Design a protein with these regions (language model features):
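Cytosolic regulatory modules rich in charged/polar residues
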Residues: 1-174
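Alpha-helical transmembrane segments and their membrane-interface boundaries
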Residues: 6, 113-251, 255-259, 263-277, ...
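Active-site His/Glu-centered metal-binding helix of metallohydrolases
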Residues: 289-290
Length: 305
């Protein structure tokens, strides 16, 4: 609802009754001047308790959150979420009140964005529905599957370059899927948390602070998992030096995968690219490749083949 600051409470109530016939729910009462420029908002309690002869200019609240017609949907959603608003007024470039956006409108937008981000994280490159035709579904899914295919072929090619290592220590071959899986899982975890933080506008501070935090977290997780690998090796009678090699490789891979999963979404966001694309096959495939390379180079340094 919209009222003029020059009106009295009595005339305001009369006008509001007229406007109420055209709305299903009253979220807020906005106050404008004679040129329809937004001046503030009016509390229903203040309206009901004020004298009927009191002017609206004496009781309205001048502090009001608003957005312009050029404000992006994502920014509107963040503002309404931050201040817990049921509705927010919309003004044009001159400050004239042109409408409002309600929480119902934003909920629909958030739902659509969540569905899109989920599809991107799952490796679906465009918005599709389950009942779309085969052509549309194929076009949406195939690009990331092709990326995964080339990533897998790259891993095979890399493994071929370490024939000597696999001949000398065939046990390394059996731990390769474990290293690749841990790299992919850690990368997806890190990227998912960062993407969520970017969406909620809570990822703040310097890149250096984020770097120190992620390295510290990766060191803790990697050390615990590496220790479990060593204990497993001791339990099954595996060569201790091989267990240490695998444990150190896993620690290194977890650190690198965590950094990739953290900073790729941040960099994409700063470049104006949707960071959600970094949470799925892209992170998994890249971390698989880096993980395998790192695994065998560390094994080469320790085992000396």
């Amino acid at each position: 609802m919209k009222v003029k600051e020059t009106w009295t409470v009595a005339s305001c109530v009369i006008e509001m009754r007229k406007q109420a016939e055209n709305v299903t729910r009253v979220h807020s009462i906005y106050v404008t001047d004679d040129d329809d420029k937004l001046k503030g908002r009016l509390s229903l309690k203040d309206l009901l308790t004020a004298s009927t002869k009191t002017h609206i200019s004496d009781v309205y609240i001048s502090k009001v959150d608003y957005v312009s017609v050029d404000t992006k949907d994502e920014e509107v959603a963040k503002i309404m979420q931050k201040y817990d608003l049921e509705a927010i007024p919309v003004v044009d470039q001159k400050g004239v009140l042109v409408g409002r956006i309600t929480i119902d409108d934003i909920v629909d937008f958030i739902k659509e964005e969540a569905e899109k981000d989920y599809q991107l994280a799952a490796g679906i490159s465009q918005d599709v529905e389950a009942d779309d035709n085969i052509y549309e579904l194929t076009k949406a899914r195939l690009p990331w599957l092709v990326l995964g295919l080339f990533g897998g072929l790259g891993s095979v090619y890399i493994l071929q370059g370490f024939d000597e290592a696999l001949s000398s220590y065939p046990i390394l071959f059996f731990f390769t899927p474990l290293i690749a899986a841990m790299a992919g899982n850690v990368g997806v975890q890190s990227s998912a948390i960062i993407v969520q933080g970017l969406a909620n506008d809570v990822v703040k501070g310097s890149m250096f602070h984020r770097l120190i935090k992620e390295v510290g977290l990766a060191l803790i997780n990697g050390s615990i998992l590496g220790l479990l690998v060593v204990l497993f090796g001791a339990f099954v009678g595996q060569d201790f030096i091989v267990s240490i090699t695998i444990a150190l490789s896993m620690l290194s891979v977890i650190i690198i995968a965590s950094l990739i999963g953290t900073f790729v979404p941040i960099i994409l966001d700063r470049k104006g690219i949707d960071p959600a694309i970094a949470t799925g096959p892209f992170i998994t495939t890249s971390n698989d490749i880096f993980g395998i390379i790192l695994f065998f180079y560390i094994a080469k340094l320790i085992l000396g083949f």
